[in-house]
Each structure stands twice: as C-alpha cells, then as structure tokens.
C-alpha cells in the first residue's frame, strides 16, 4: 500500500 492517494495511479 502507498502512503498517499496521489502516489497511486490506479
């Protein structure tokens, strides 16, 4: 899981 919503493209 990534920290921030902006980090995840999908």
From Swiss-Prot:
Query: Would the keyword Disulfide bond be found if you checked this record's keyword annotation?
Result: yes
Q: Which GO terms describe its cellular component?
A: extracellular region
Primary residence: secreted
Expression across tissues:
Expressed by the venom gland.
Cite a single GO MF annotation.
toxin activity
Q: What keywords are assigned to this protein?
A: Disulfide bond, Hemostasis impairing toxin, Platelet aggregation activating toxin, Secreted, Toxin
Q: Where in the cell is it found?
A: Secreted
Question: Its domain of life?
Answer: Eukaryota
The entry sums up its family as follows: Belongs to the snaclec family.
Assembly and binders: Hexamer of heterodimers of subunits alpha and beta (alphabeta)(6); disulfide-linked.
What does the protein in this record do?
Answer: Potently induces platelet aggregation of washed human platelet and platelet-rich plasma in a concentration-dependent manner. It acts by binding to GPVI (GP6), leading to kinases-dependent exposure of functional alpha-IIb/beta-3 and platelet aggregation, and also induces metalloproteinase-dependent GP6 shedding from platelets.
Fill in the misc note.
Negative results: does not bind to GPIb and alpha-2 integrin. Does not agglutinate the formalin-fixed platelets, even at high concentrations.
Protein name in the entry: Snaclec trowaglerix subunit beta
């Amino acid at each position: 899981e990534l920290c921030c919503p902006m980090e995840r493209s999908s």
